[in-house]
Amino acid sequence: MSMLFISGLTNVETTVAIPGFPLPYAPVHYPFHGIQSTVSGVGVNVAKALHRLGHSTQLHSLIGPDLAGDTVMMALEQAGMSTHGMSRILSATPQSVILYDPDGRRQIQVDLKECQETPLPDGYEPALQQCELAILCNINFSRSLLATAKRLNKLIACDVHVL
């Protein structure tokens, strides 16, 4: 299959089951088996899905030199995915918390750290040159890649995940 270049958010996501919205105040809630953490983010989710479909993927993303960043690297390696494009240049790895109720309603709190102000470091162009498709997810550090991918005459795909 083809080599796909993916640039997008990587974060550690924690989901929390709640009884409903609005969440009534209490000093402590005990949602037994209702709190889960996983490596996620649009970039990871797209790369993981395409990897499972048999494509060679190279995810380019920003994480931090922290425990959450270690978790990201371990999860990608366990999935058999390349970590070559992961840059540990943020002060900390982005994280999110998602509250969800039994009806499926959810509220997402996302801490992007300095993702929106930090570009991908130099060195991604050889991978972009070799790819058959540049998948550039909706995060600021992907924007500058549009011009490079166009200059290299690459097919470009972008996501729209919130309307």
Question: Where are the regions a protein language model picked out?
Answer:
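Short beta-strand scaffold segments in enzyme catalytic cores
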Residues: 48, 95-99, 107
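Short, well-ordered alpha-helical microsegments
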Residues: 69, 94, 142-146
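A glycine-rich beta-to-alpha transition motif near the start of alpha/beta enzyme domains, typified by
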Residues: 56-84
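Glycine-rich phosphate/adenosyl-contacting loop at the front of the ribokinase-like
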Residues: 1-60, 69, 154
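Ribokinase/PfkB-type carbohydrate-kinase core domain
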Residues: 2-12, 75-88, 101-163
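Conserved beta-strand edge residues that scaffold enzyme active sites
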Residues: 64-65, 90-91, 163
